[in-house]
């Protein structure tokens, strides 16, 4: 194995290892930290960690792909492709689950509001005050692009259902539990991908 190929594989494996570590830490925190703490006080941290994880995922995918397509035919091992697909597959899975959950949540919310309005038309929409408070307390990391008034979070409910941005609010504990399970699945995939990449690299002939 050439020095250049060894460097690209080393960067790829290291990036994937840190990526898997971030997902593992995030999964543990999601199970242990209450949802209101995450949404009200850790928005900045979560956003920043997400940016780092995304960068590591791109770095890992890029260098694994470079290691595969830039290597001679007899050194193009399947584990390089499998490892390169870990980050894109994880991101696609979480994106699909997020959109599905937002749509299901929006439908259940509309049904609940319709039932409530039928019983008492003068009753205000649930969590109205919470929406205002969450909007006022939300923070973004330093260097984050400016957020205009009324802008919708790309991972929020409003962008999926074409509703006003005020419909985005903290999800209940049940939703947090479901997301934690999906995050655990992605974490497991990342760990398996990292382990098989390590075994593949050290199992190759020098």
From Swiss-Prot:
Membrane topology: Multi-pass membrane protein
Transmembrane annotation, as ranges: 13-35, 52-72, 78-98, 183-203
Region (Disordered): 111-130
Subcellular location: Mitochondrion membrane
Keyword set, alphabetical order: Autophagy, Membrane, Mitochondrion, Transmembrane, Transmembrane helix
Keyword RNA-binding: no
Segments of skewed composition (Polar residues): 114-125
Lineage top rank: taxon: Eukaryota
A GO BP annotation: macroautophagy
GO cellular component terms attached to this protein's record: mitochondrial outer membrane
Function comment: Involved in the selective degradation of mitochondria via autophagy during starvation and at post-log phase.
Family: Belongs to the ATG33 family.
Descriptive protein name: Autophagy-related protein 33
Organism: Zygosaccharomyces rouxii (strain ATCC 2623 / CBS 732 / NBRC 1130 / NCYC 568 / NRRL Y-229)
